[in-house]
Amino acid sequence: MNESLPESPAKRFSRLFRKAGVFLAKEQFDQALMVFREGEALAVALDDKEKLALFREEIIQCEKHLRE
């Protein structure tokens, strides 16, 4: 298996959502927020408006939990 092949954007987005989900399950909203912001930056860089909207919605939800 060639380790030098870059990960596809779909796999990168999926990995970020799974990683954030682990933090959300543990109620570690600050860590989840950091991961969602990483996903937001990736979506901006790739000009993926659909994923950008998803990450931004999750960011809003995390920020609400942090304010509670």
Language-model regions: role of each:
Residues M1, E40-A41, D47-D48:
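Amphipathic alpha-helical segments of tetratricopeptide repeats
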Residues E58-E68:
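Alpha-helical linker/edge segments of TPR/alpha-solenoid repeat scaffolds
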